[in-house]
């Protein structure tokens, strides 16, 4: 196995512990490896958790289980299918690309790197995302997000493109309780959002040219990953956007220290 640049693992009927031990064994024996391909993945959890290797790509064919890429710092994970709950949980750096949809709490507590989901995400996606100095996590959702998107968000960027698999508009966003408890970062949704769709502590802010320049590179990267045509990319960049941001940095402060507010 030493000296190999690519290794293929057939994960059919393999327990998640066995699969993850196999991945770490490969990395120990061949630290210069560039690509690991996992085939017949079906619900195995914790894939690539804690791996710190910037020049590694992990391609997954199938449906990985929960906490994909948790605590990961560096690798690129490409999922040719859907993913279960919490991909990118507390991820520090790297990229996760999901060609299908993902489950609840996608990008939970993410603190760096990028997650691109071509389809939809489940409830409470982006919960507790946080940023520090140059560490700015980014979650880009191609389709729709269920309720409580960006709950208790402390930093980072969430972008919702609101398009189907062909790049057509999905209509008005229906998610509720968006940004509940948000106290940092910003959520950008293509299309209009009503005030009654917002959660406590969230507010609709003016979308500026500076905001467009901020999200433009991530939209372009999304289009590149998923091979979207130029006309779809241009439509996304020239659409009406809604920016959702915190009312304040301490939205619940007066509940605990009213004398300091």
From Swiss-Prot:
One MF annotation (Gene Ontology) recorded for this entry: oxidoreductase activity
Disulfide bonds: none
SUPFAM superfamilies per UniProt: Alpha subunit of glutamate synthase, C-terminal domain
Protein name as catalogued: Uncharacterized protein MJ1350
UniProt superkingdom: Archaea
Pfam family, one: GXGXG
CDD domains in alphabetical order: arch_gltB
Originating organism: Methanocaldococcus jannaschii (strain ATCC 43067 / DSM 2661 / JAL-1 / JCM 10045 / NBRC 100440)
Assigned protein family: Belongs to the FwdC/FmdC family.
């Amino acid at each position: 196995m030493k000296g190999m640049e690519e290794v293929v693992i057939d994960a059919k009927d393999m327990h998640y512990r066995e699969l993850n031990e196999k991945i770490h064994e490969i990395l120990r024996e061949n630290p210069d490896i560039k690509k690991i391909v996992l085939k017949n993945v079906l619900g195995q959890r914790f894939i690539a958790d804690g791996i710190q290797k910037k020049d590694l790509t992990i391609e997954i064919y199938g449906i990985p289980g929960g906490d994909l890429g948790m605590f990961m710092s560096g690798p690129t994970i490409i999922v040719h299918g859907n993913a279960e709950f919490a991909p990118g949980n507390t991820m520090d750096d790297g990229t996760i690309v999901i060609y299908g949809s993902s489950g609840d709490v996608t990008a939970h507590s993410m603190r760096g790197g990028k997650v691109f989901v071509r389809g939809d995400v489940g409830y409470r996606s982006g919960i507790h995302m946080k940023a520090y100095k140059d560490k700015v996590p980014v979650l880009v959702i191609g389709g729709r997000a269920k309720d409580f998107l960006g709950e208790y968000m402390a930093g980072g960027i969430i972008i919702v493109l609101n398009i189907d698999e062909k790049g057509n508009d999905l209509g008005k966003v229906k998610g509720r309780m968006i940004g509940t408890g948000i106290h940092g970062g910003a959520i950008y949704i293509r299309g209009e959002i009503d005030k009654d769709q917002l959660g406590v502590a969230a507010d609709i802010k003016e979308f500026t040219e500076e905001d467009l320049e901020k999200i433009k590179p991530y939209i372009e990267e999304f289009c590149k990953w998923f091979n979207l045509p130029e006309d779809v990319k241009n439509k996304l960049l020239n659409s009406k956007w809604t920016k959702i941001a915190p009312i304040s940095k301490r939205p619940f402060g007066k509940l605990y220290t009213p004398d300091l507010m």
